[in-house]
Amino acid sequence: EHCNGCGLCIAACPEPYGLQETPADAEYELQDPGKLFGDRMTDAPEPVEIPNEIVPLQKMEPLVLKGNYAAAVGALLAGCRHFFGYPITPSAGGGALMAKLLPPLEGMFLQAVSEVAAVNMMYGCGGAGMRCMTFTSSPGFSLMVEGISYMIGSEVPGVFINVMRGGPGLGNIAPEQADIKLVCRGLGHGNTHAIVLAPSTPQEMLDLTMLAFDLAFKYRNPVVIASDGYLGQMTGKVSMPASMVKPGIPEWAVWGDKDHRRNLISSIYLAETDLEAWNVHLNEKYEAMKVEQRADLYMCDDAEVLLVACTTPSRMAKGAVQALRAQGIRAGLFRPVTLWPFPIEKLKAVLPHTKRIVVVEASNGQLEDELRLALANASVHDVPEIQHVRHFGGVLPQMAEIVANVAAGQEVTV
């Protein structure tokens, strides 16, 4: 077997040039190994993409599914045949369904010894160009963020469904939104970002999971789905899509066939200038991701009071909008479907007639922080007054509470 010419041995060698004689005038940081040793010695062909196939599905009646189950079905329809995870409540139901469905589909379900092991298995599987995923919940997701940083640094795709629960620490298994800061601003060490999708119904759990795989491979980057404990267990009507995906193999994949064997995936850049250039590339990719901003606007065309909420609290906020409208208060709901990148362009469109923003969330202001940061980064100076209705620890804002305090012009923090 010939050397595939990846160059990793040169980059990682503890001596500047290994067993080769070092040129007298060599400066290690500035030396190009290609100039020293010539062209890469490999007979491997240039990698070739094996494209995805879209398989039409027969029309069928809607199903009634839990949110976690809907996400699992969405993953299968998106072509995911590899699952790595460690069971943790309230996300375990999704993994349990994958354990039943993957073997008959010739897929791989592997319960790892820990979340740390699971994310590194995803690194290897995603690096081979395979669609892979995990279900986890807040403490488990915390254990995965080191591996997520490695995946981002190596441009390895994967889908992480974080069914958020109460914290910090062991907390409880009730729903909370206190991982928003973690998924938007804390995906491990270094310069990391990932698209974060926030569903609010079982139907969106399926739809956004399918979308997550497409985005993960479009950008060669992990994608996070930020669900919560109620949404994972909530049942609802779920319609199946018109087609499913039979995935191929990307040209960059470290795959065992002849057409891909010269590929290498790594996040090692020993020269500072090389790592800086790689971070510039990542920043350009993060900037390109901003076109993926998504939001759902409900009665926002003439809204003077704009409720901002996501996941399960957005359902209470939607009911509050209806009740406030019945009282003659022109309220609307702005629901960010992408928490990162925050859908600031869609928000800016409704700000001219907005007099007050009320952020409804089950956390200590983490959604409001994303809102304020997006407004600041977009140089929006004429910002309406921002208030909030907040609860923590698994307690959710209630519709009647939102209505009463919006009508009174007050904010609530427990």
Where are these regions (language model features)?
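Peripheral docking tails and interdomain loops at the edges
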Residues: 361-414
